[in-house]
A protein has these predicted regions:
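Terminal, non-globular segments
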Residues: 2-215
Length: 215
């Protein structure tokens, strides 16, 4: 990691924390809406990231397993809930997608472990599910009669952030082992990963400041 990437990485974490603070400042006004769970989610993600960064100084643990089995599944399942359960009002879709994602750990452990092509099958599959939900959300917003007021739709900012970060970096994490052999390409994509993560959390902050949502 070069000095620029180190700066981006540190900024990423603190912007996550800043976003959590912005969200918590809006908790009182959203206590009766499901968006309060998004606030809790952002706060927990920051805590998880802080543990991932500094927790090793106090307790020995595998960061790879921590992220693969705790942090990332938590993030994916929350977004499935936010999109399928709440935005689309489809409880069955949420449970189906969550189950499919959890089942993807089976082939990931038994068939793709140690693969030099696919870095993490369960992450790739989870991101693919999220990509489908993102496209569905765009369709919902585009066909909405309230499209003219898209800038006041909190979900617009969330969806854009998820698109840039999770969907935009899907090829990077899927073909990580292949890309690492091409250092220049890998560095460019890693820079994008860090920048898009920062932009995503800034968009999450904007969603609380500018966005409004009924429910």
């Amino acid at each position: 990691m070069n000095s620029f990437q180190k700066l981006l990485s540190d900024s990423f974490l603190w912007i996550e924390g800043g976003t959590a603070m912005v969200a918590l400042l809006h908790l009182r006004g959203l206590k009766r809406q499901y968006w309060r769970f998004f606030i809790y989610f952002l706060a927990l993600v920051f805590i998880c990231e802080a543990i991932g960064k500094w927790g090793g100084a106090y307790i020995s643990f595998s960061k790879t397993k921590y992220y693969n089995y705790v942090v990332i599944p938590f993030q994916f399942i929350f977004f499935y809930w936010l999109y399928a359960f709440k935005s689309f009002n489809n409880k069955k879709l949420f449970w189906t997608l969550s189950l499919l994602y959890l089942l993807s750990f089976i082939p990931s452990e038994f068939y793709f472990k140690g693969s030099k092509i696919i870095f993490s099958f369960n992450y790739t599959f989870g991101s693919f599910i999220l990509m489908v939900l993102v496209v569905m959300e765009y369709y919902k917003q585009i066909t909405s009669s309230d499209i003219i007021n898209f800038n006041r739709n909190r979900m617009f900012y969330v969806n854009l952030g998820v698109t840039l970060f999770y969907i935009g970096t899907l090829p990077f994490w899927t073909f990580y082992y292949l890309l690492v052999e091409y250092k220049q390409i890998w560095n460019i994509y890693f820079d994008y990963f860090l920048v898009s993560g920062i932009v995503m959390y800034l968009l999450f902050s904007i969603s609380f400041i500018w966005g409004k949502q009924n429910s």
